[in-house]
């Protein structure tokens, strides 16, 4: 028996993003991808490529069972939510490819003119990853985003915030008062957490 695909829209703390949650797995557990343009999605995610045909779509983030879409400021969600929800639902229902292959990790794609920071493996990496996975990732995913641990060096934990967390007005507070305090409590060696 085929279970019909359902997709519902869920607001996030970031007013420019909306989370579209499916009753089907879109990617493997722990996998996520983010695309800032149709060109970035080309050859990786046909779903994201098609979503960029909507003129108001600025970013597409896909993970286990949801797609988070970031829109331009000039169109209210009231006018586009149903159209996007139906599009995602129909794409999944028709068996359209969500992802053909994983792109190179986002941490290895520097912004133009910026160098990529390469972190040495530290004795704290596993403990930090475990704390982020257990306490932080579920809450961040619930808000339509993701957190990626990039490295630890001299008391500083560096992470990447993705999906609805990227550019969210409350992400700085979450980072400093939530994540940083949690890591400091469990690992006194941690002095600060920064996002890139």
Can you describe what each PLM-predicted range is?
Residues 1-196:
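Domain-level signature for proteins that mediate thiol-based redox and metal-cofactor handling
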